[in-house]
Amino acid sequence: MELSFTTSIAVATIVFVLFKLATRPKSNKKLLPEPWRLPIIGHMHHLIGTMPHRGVMDLARKYGSLMHLQLGEVSTIVVSSPKWAKEILTTHDITFANRPETLTGEIIAYHNTDIVLAPYGEYWRQLRKLCTLELLSVKKVKSFQSLREEECWNLVQEVKESGSGRPVDLSENIFKMIATILSRAAFGKGIKDQKEFTEIVKEILRQTGGFDVADIFPSKKFLHHLSGKRARLTSIHKKLDNLINNIVAEHPGNNSSKSNETLLDVMLRLKDSVEFPLTADNVKAIILDMFGAGTDTSSATVEWAISELIRCPRAMEKVQAELRQALKGKDKVKEEDIQDLSYLDLVIKETLRLHPPLPLVMPRECRQPVNLAGYDIANKTKLIVNVFAINRDPEYWKDAESFIPERFENSPITVMGAEYEYLPFGAGRRMCPGAALGLANVQLPLANILYHFNWKLPNGASHDQLDMTESFGATVQRKTHLVLVPSF
């Protein structure tokens, strides 16, 4: 039987491909382990239908704690163990100090000029210095104590006014409270467009996270338009830019001491510094970091802490007893009242272990070719450190999936990235610079919510019926809002 034209072409193509495979030069390079891949999309099919941090963790358990993934056009190495995290984030930290370019960073973050996405170099080093010495110093974080206490008290009053025994949407209330705290820290009391600003930030966070088609096929610019991503981000950015311009224009400035400066005051004071001048867009990009990233991560952590405590009545009873014994019936909670509460600290540490704010941290990018344990890593290879997997590594953590705050008792482990089995804020040069501010915005709100109220699920549901399903975005949030019934 004669072969059809189509069959002939197919046979010829197969023969040609096999010939090319057989005759291509043999490489002596040692290749990282990886799953089987498909043409064009690489390994993306392994992650379809999963939470990215969980899907990548499952692959690592099969292919190793240092593995390769081809995500579309982007060659990526994934680190899922303390051993490899320490190797890369210490020995090779500067080699992997860059950030990969993203469409979101280009449009929303004013061409990647914020602290989070700025490429490694002199500009980033100066931004880091600005954060360390001015914006996010211990002294500056402390200066916002009174507004944290005031906004926490406002939340307590709102819950009390709603009435004992009536369900409260804690997700919405916590997000609003922390957004207000950060808004006041950034801009001062009472910006006119705060609600609109908060909604825009929420939309940005919804557009961020996961593996976006525009970022895994960066050379295919038509996909940016075909997916609608560029148009959506451009529209969001236009609204955002107008709002921040209005906020800056209406900002009264600071005529008193540095101790009363808002974050915007600090940047406007330093904007025309001879040593390190900032453009108007630089200021806006940094402000967006302070407000956007801080609101999402802190509110998510408070929500997850309460969720875990609801599911673990023993721990809930213990932390509430500690708070109520220490405060002895006081009306308002002050930060100095809770600084030495050990079990509250354990609860926060354990929450950050199980629910790190950024489970895949922020991806890095290789700045030059490097050899890792005999594996050749090419320039511009993307690095993902799966903190979610590291924090649940059964080799380092007994009953790793269980919420057990006591595991941190008498432990030297801190949240600051010195121990590589526990990296809630990352480690190395690109570690989250806002860890101190983030912790302050978790500790006091959580203490107030637990001290003033007892909580239960609505409709008589038992504690183990609480839905803990995740939703992936810029951070990992609860998929459903945390709605609980207070009593007081």
Curated annotation (Swiss-Prot):
Entry superkingdom: Eukaryota
Example of a GO biological process term: sesquiterpene biosynthetic process
Enzyme class: oxidoreductase
Binding residues annotated for heme, in chain numbering: 432
Membrane topology: Single-pass type II membrane protein
GO CC term, one of those recorded: endoplasmic reticulum membrane
Gene3D superfamilies per UniProt: Cytochrome P450
Protein keywords: Endoplasmic reticulum, Glycoprotein, Heme, Iron, Membrane, Metal-binding, Monooxygenase, Oxidoreductase, Signal-anchor, Transmembrane, Transmembrane helix
Family annotation (InterPro entries): Cyt_P450, Cyt_P450_CS, Cyt_P450_E_grp-I, Cyt_P450_sf
SUPFAM superfamilies assigned to the protein according to its UniProt record, in alphabetical order: Cytochrome P450
Residue spans crossing the bilayer: 7-23
Parts of the chain on the Lumenal side: 24-488
Family of the protein in this entry: Belongs to the cytochrome P450 family.
Listed PANTHER family: CYTOCHROME P450 FAMILY 71 PROTEIN, PREMNASPIRODIENE OXYGENASE-LIKE
Function: Involved in the biosynthesis of germacrene-derived sesquiterpene lactones. Catalyzes three consecutive oxidations of germacrene A to produce germacrene A acid. Could also catalyze the three-step oxidation of non-natural substrate amorphadiene to artemisinic acid.
The name this protein goes by in its record: Germacrene A hydroxylase
Provenance organism: Saussurea costus (Costus)
Gene (UniProt): GAO
